[in-house]
């Protein structure tokens, strides 16, 4: 069987607040245009891309991002927190037009700070792939509960290769209890790469993971000056083999 590859990127844009303390949404869009779009992405996941407080209004020009990247903004109202939001609690996904969406959900995650995930099932060539983007809690016990919630969702959905990407806030290189297969019902794997803080990366908070038969290849952090100024996280990019 010939395997295809999906090029995926994830970036916590810190609500457009740069390392200089300035809030500049256009700077984030420019960084995506100059540092991510040329990579030929199939999937772009953003976190902290809506305002933190209700009504979680959109911060970025998602139409401009779609135009510059060649990707499609996928969030109809069913995938947004509210009419003023661009995503679901700050999580936004853009997909290549070659990926046809077959099912989509938002997943409410427990915790004292409202968190969520966006799940898309897409047709890629002759097969189906599930893409989940999320931003997990800073608290390890809450991350475990949140991953269990995602696992309960997966058990209700048809079996298919799953890609999980986003700011998982897991700083331990060896992983942790949140990655145990019994929580998710599957074993997610991927490289560990330091991505935070952007000015001197020390912690591997941002992850791109997949389960069998997929493999995460060529993972790297994008550390251009423009990107490092735009957010306190670096974006990470990887290729994932899919059927």
Q: For each predicted feature, which ranges?
A:
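Metal-dependent phosphoester-hydrolase catalytic domains
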Residues: 99, 105-109, 121-123, 140, ...
């Amino acid at each position: 069987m010939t395997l295809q590859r999906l090029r995926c990127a994830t970036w916590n844009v810190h609500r457009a607040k740069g390392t200089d303390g300035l809030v500049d949404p256009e700077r984030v869009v420019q960084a995506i245009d100059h540092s991510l779009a040329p990579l030929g992405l199939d999937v772009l996941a953003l976190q902290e891309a809506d305002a933190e407080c209700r009504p979680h209004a959109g911060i970025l020009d998602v139409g401009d991002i779609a135009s510059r990247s060649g990707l499609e903004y996928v969030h109809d109202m069913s995938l947004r927190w509210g009419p003023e939001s661009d995503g679901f609690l700050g999580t936004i996904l853009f997909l290549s037009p070659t990926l046809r969406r077959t099912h989509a959900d938002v997943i409410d995650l427990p915790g004292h700070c409202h968190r969520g995930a966006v799940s898309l099932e897409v047709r890629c060539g002759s097969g189906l792939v599930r893409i989940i983007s999320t931003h997990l809690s800073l608290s390890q016990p809450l991350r475990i509960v949140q991953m269990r919630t995602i696992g309960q969702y997966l058990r209700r959905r048809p079996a298919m290769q799953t890609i999980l990407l986003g700011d998982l806030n897991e700083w331990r290189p060896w992983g942790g209890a949140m990655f145990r297969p019994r929580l998710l019902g599957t074993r997610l794997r991927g490289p560990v790469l330091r991505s935070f803080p952007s000015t001197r990366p020390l912690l591997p908070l941002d992850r791109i993971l997949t389960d069998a038969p997929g493999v995460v290849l060529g993972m790297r952090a994008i550390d251009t000056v423009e990107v490092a100024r735009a957010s306190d996280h670096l974006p990470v990019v990887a290729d994932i083999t899919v059927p």
